[in-house]
């Protein structure tokens, strides 16, 4: 029994060593630790960049980047370079790395600014950054992130959409339509569906497909179903527009017009006809009543396919081939 315990202890020790080495390999070497040297490096900058500076420079110490109790926290030079020329001549020489707006003539190149952040932020959500649509469109980290502010707006659910809408103006307009996701209410945000740092799916979606992303919340629509509706299986956006619509619930067009994009001709009733509705067209001794007749209940105008076909996402009822139950 004693030998067994020794082997178990040895196995646990080896496991810890392997796990520790793997974890270390996943992380880049941390920047300067919270030492007097690190504080001295910061002091070279904060001597001038103090509370009187127009930008909120010192507030970085209220963020994880400025937490001197964390050995991973960078110094000013970790991000802006040693900038010895700038220290010697602040007015005449700009820092080695300048994170500024596009109108700043001294701003560093997109690649230099991005690579500076990626020195530490390499894994996790950033692993698909290279080749992503934001990367290829020369979007840099500081276009979205406010590193020196205590509360980065893009990381808060309530304020994140405003950061995204600075560029995505069409989507800003769409969320003000009648039927929308609860973005304005602060109950969800852009990154619930999109990963702005890159993705294996289309449109920077957090999952590999549109449907898998939608099923994250709408699990009841996932299936599998005994009777499947092919456009639903193919892509939710065949019928829905995710950012907002004036046809509820987030439909691309009103029913029955939406349905008739596929179900036209002999496959379903026309909007001005009662053909193929239960009971068919009303008839008199002289034949079929025309449009505007005294029997409007057999016409499809102002009626919805969903009145009868209530299970359009799929049905598990043995008699649900027409999605009526």
Where are these regions (language model features)?
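Positively charged n-region of N-terminal signal peptides that target proteins for export
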Residues: 1-6
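Bacterial N-terminal signal peptides
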Residues: 8-19
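Short sequence/structural segments immediately N-terminal
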Residues: 20-325
């Amino acid at each position: 029994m004693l030998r067994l315990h020794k082997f178990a202890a040895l196995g646990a020790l080896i496991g810890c060593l392997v796990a520790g080495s793997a974890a270390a390999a996943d992380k880049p070497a941390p920047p300067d630790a919270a030492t007097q040297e690190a504080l001295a490096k910061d002091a070279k900058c904060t001597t001038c960049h103090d509370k009187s500076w127009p930008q909120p420079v010192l507030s970085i110490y209220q963020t994880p980047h400025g937490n001197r109790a964390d050995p991973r926290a960078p110094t000013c030079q970790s991000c802006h370079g040693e900038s010895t020329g700038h220290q010697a001549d602040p007015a005449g020489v700009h820092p080695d790395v300048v994170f500024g707006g596009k109108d700043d003539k001294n701003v560093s190149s997109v690649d230099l600014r991005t690579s500076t952040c990626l020195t530490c932020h390499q894994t996790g959500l950033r692993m698909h950054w290279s080749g992503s649509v934001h990367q290829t469109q020369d979007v840099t980290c500081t276009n979205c992130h406010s590193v020196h502010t205590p509360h980065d707006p893009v990381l808060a659910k309530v304020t994140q959409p405003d950061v995204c809408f600075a560029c995505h103006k069409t989507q800003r307009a769409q969320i003000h339509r009648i039927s929308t996701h609860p973005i304005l209410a602060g109950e969800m945000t852009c990154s619930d569906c999109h990963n702005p740092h890159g993705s294996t799916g289309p449109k920077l979606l957090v999952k590999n497909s549109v449907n898998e992303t939608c099923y994250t919340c709408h699990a009841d629509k996932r299936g599998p179903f005994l009777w499947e509706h092919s456009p639903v299986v193919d892509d939710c956006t065949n019928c829905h527009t995710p950012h907002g619509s004036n046809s509820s619930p987030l439909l691309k067009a009103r029913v029955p017009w939406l349905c008739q994009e596929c179900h036209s001709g002999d496959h379903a009733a026309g909007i001005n006809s009662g053909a193929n509705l239960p009971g068919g067209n009303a008839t008199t001794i002289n034949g079929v009543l025309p449009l505007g007749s005294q029997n409007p209940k057999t016409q499809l105008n102002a009626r919805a396919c969903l009145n009868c076909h209530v299970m359009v996402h799929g049905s598990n009822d043995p008699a649900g081939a027409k999605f009526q139950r």
